[in-house]
């Protein structure tokens, strides 16, 4: 991983939520690095706010897909529950952390977001990289319908685009709006194509995917 602890208290703060025996996993806040543009910085703040919270199955109607969000860029798991539920799935192109978190939520456990635990982590993806990354996201949603099909994920993406647009207008960063539109378009197109990858030619799927090694016969057995 390319995440860097923001301070020396990362592990200590990541473990604090386990004082609640119902918490089965906890994940840290991600802060954009110095080379990030303001859109990436806003995205990190949107996905990783300063306020802590604990999610349970009761939050599904309100939070939707975000209930299952638990980025393993920097996360911890209660070992006995992790093993009891079988650990990370062995066959997935992407999203093993969210699939694990969904299993925990559905089993009645809770997921904690601990923003006091901080790591520096962000990426500057090109339009093509945004497309391929979200293609793989769509593939994972297709392959695990029991986890993802019952909850719409597009609404959260639309909310992010709207909030980012409002932010850019407020900051008078009008020249960045076309970039936001293009980035969002490539993300959405990639996701929708990945969601329907099984009706596409295999050679085309390989070209669209970021994680090309996943499509080797050995990895898919």
List where the protein language model places each region.
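Short acidic donor-binding/metal-coordinating loop in glycosyltransferase active sites
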Residues: 1-3, 96
């Amino acid at each position: 991983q390319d995440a860097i602890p923001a301070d020396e208290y990362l592990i200590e703060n990541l473990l604090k939520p386990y004082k609640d025996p119902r918490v089965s996993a906890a994940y840290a806040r991600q802060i954009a690095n110095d080379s990030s543009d303001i859109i990436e910085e806003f995205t990190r703040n949107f996905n990783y706010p300063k306020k802590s919270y604990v999610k349970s199955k009761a939050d599904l109607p309100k939070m939707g897909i975000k209930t299952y969000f638990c980025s393993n860029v920097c996360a911890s798991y209660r070992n006995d529950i992790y093993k009891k539920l079988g650990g990370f799935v062995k066959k997935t192109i992407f999203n093993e952390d969210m699939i694990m978190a969904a299993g925990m939520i559905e089993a009645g456990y809770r997921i904690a977001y601990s923003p006091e635990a901080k790591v520096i982590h962000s990426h500057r993806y090109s339009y093509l990289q945004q497309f391929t990354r979200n293609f793989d996201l769509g593939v994972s949603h297709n392959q695990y319908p029991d986890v993802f099909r019952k909850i719409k994920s597009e609404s959260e993406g639309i909310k992010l685009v709207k909030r980012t647009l409002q932010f850019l207008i407020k900051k008078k960063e009008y020249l960045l709006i076309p970039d936001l539109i293009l980035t969002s378009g490539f993300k959405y197109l990639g996701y929708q194509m990945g969601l329907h990858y099984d009706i596409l030619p295999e050679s085309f799927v390989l070209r669209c995917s970021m994680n090309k090694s996943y499509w080797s016969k050995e990895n898919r057995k």
